[in-house]
């Protein structure tokens, strides 16, 4: 998973402010994400999408932070992100769980494909990656919906993900 930032120190503070306090900094984070993804995956994707939040969380916050990131990144590529996923279950926040197994179980069956990605190479965007289980599940759903390939990028990786060497 490509990422411009490690989720620690000032980057962590900025991302938490962005995520939970009105989306401040979306343009900056989106620009960092766009540059990183373009450098890592140049020519490897046909369209970009994002990991969606649940309808309840979107109503509570007033926005979907990862959609904001995707829109900001795509503006720099002079395109629009495509909504390909829907969160159908309002599961507990991944950050409330410990360990990859618990996080994996928490996201199984939580997402459905809602857009056409048949034969497309998809760039899947997220805000924070800890174990990669959410991205893995979303990538699985997109592949089952016909995506030719799925590559991933996030605004930040936790040190745990950085050190794991796993792929989505």
Identify the role of each PLM range.
Residues 1-124, 131-168:
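Conserved PRPP/pyrophosphate-binding segment of the phosphoribosyltransferase/PRPP-pathway fold
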């Amino acid at each position: 998973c490509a990422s411009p930032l490690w989720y620690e120190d000032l980057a962590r503070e900025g991302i938490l402010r962005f995520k939970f306090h009105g989306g401040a900094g979306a343009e900056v984070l989106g620009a960092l994400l766009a540059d990183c993804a373009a450098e890592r995956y140049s020519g490897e994707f046909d369209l970009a999408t994002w990991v969606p939040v649940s309808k309840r969380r979107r109503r509570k916050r007033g926005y979907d932070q990862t959609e904001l990131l995707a829109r900001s990144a795509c503006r720099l590529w002079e395109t629009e992100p495509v909504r390909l996923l829907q969160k159908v279950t309002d599961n507990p926040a991944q950050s409330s769980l410990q360990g990859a197994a618990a996080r994996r179980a928490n996201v199984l069956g939580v997402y459905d494909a809602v857009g056409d990605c048949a034969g497309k190479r998809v760039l899947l965007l997220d805000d924070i990656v800890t174990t990669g289980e959410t991205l893995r599940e979303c990538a699985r759903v997109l592949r089952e919906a016909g995506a030719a390939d799925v590559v991933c990028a996030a605004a930040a990786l936790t040190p745990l993900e950085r050190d794991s060497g796993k792929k989505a």
